[in-house]
């Protein structure tokens, strides 16, 4: 699905939200494209070749999207959920960590660089934008894709950062299966948060 069209659809959805608008998760894949976050610096784009580059409004630096990468866009009313951005980022990271743990893969987050890593290789990127108390953008999990375009950038602004994907880690599950598991794990994270808030008020 075209990145620019999807991005505009997320903006429109967020601008048109009301207090009653349900939260949504959009699952898709993009054609090859580099996206520069609002903190992106030109020096991290080394040799893009014929792959288009678009400057977007999410946080962070430059990354690559392409076929075989699971994209989960989170369109959430943070104000209604009483959820802060830092807490949401932690929930997003834990979603991927727990998903990989179900396949006996040990992954972790990093304080200095949001995302999820297996040893020293990044397997999932995160990006968010908040407007009117609601967020969009989300999680990009590398599943079974051509990783060579990452060689043409400093991924997320880190020169030499290694990139990996589930297919390289012995996970044979298809992207369709991983989509379902990702959503299930994310909903567990959100529901756990809501339960804890309710208990603290009782």
Residue ranges and their predicted role:
Residues 1-118, 122-123, 148, 172, ...:
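N-terminal lobe of the biotin/lipoate ligase/transferase fold
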Residues 125-127:
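Beta-strand scaffold of nucleotide-dependent catalytic cores
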Residues 129-131:
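Short beta-strand micro-motifs enriched in acidic
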Residues 134-142:
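Conserved phosphate/anionic-ligand binding catalytic regions in large, soluble enzymes, centered on
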Residues 136, 147-202:
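C-terminal accessory segment of soluble enzyme catalytic cores
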């Amino acid at each position: 699905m075209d990145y620019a069209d999807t991005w505009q659809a997320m903006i429109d959805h967020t601008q048109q939200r009301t207090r009653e608008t349900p939260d949504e998760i959009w699952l898709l894949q993009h054609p090859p494209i580099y996206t520069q976050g609002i903190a992106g610096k030109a020096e991290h784009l080394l040799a893009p070749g014929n792959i288009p580059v678009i400057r977007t409004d999410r946080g962070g630096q430059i990354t690559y999207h392409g076929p075989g990468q699971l994209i989960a866009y989170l369109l959430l009313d943070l104000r209604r959920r009483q959820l802060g951005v830092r807490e949401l980022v932690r929930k997003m990271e834990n979603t991927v960590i727990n998903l990989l743990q179900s396949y006996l893969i040990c992954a972790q987050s990093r304080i200095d660089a949001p995302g999820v890593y297996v040893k020293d290789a990044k397997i999932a990127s995160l990006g968010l934008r908040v407007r009117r108390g609601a967020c969009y953008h989300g999680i990009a999990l590398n599943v079974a894709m051509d990783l060579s375009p990452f060689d043409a950038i400093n991924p997320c602004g880190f020169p030499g950062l290694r990139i990996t994907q589930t297919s390289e880690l012995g996970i044979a599950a298809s992207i369709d299966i991983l989509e379902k598991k990702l959503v299930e794990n994310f909903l567990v994270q959100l529901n756990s948060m809501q339960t804890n808030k309710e208990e603290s008020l009782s």
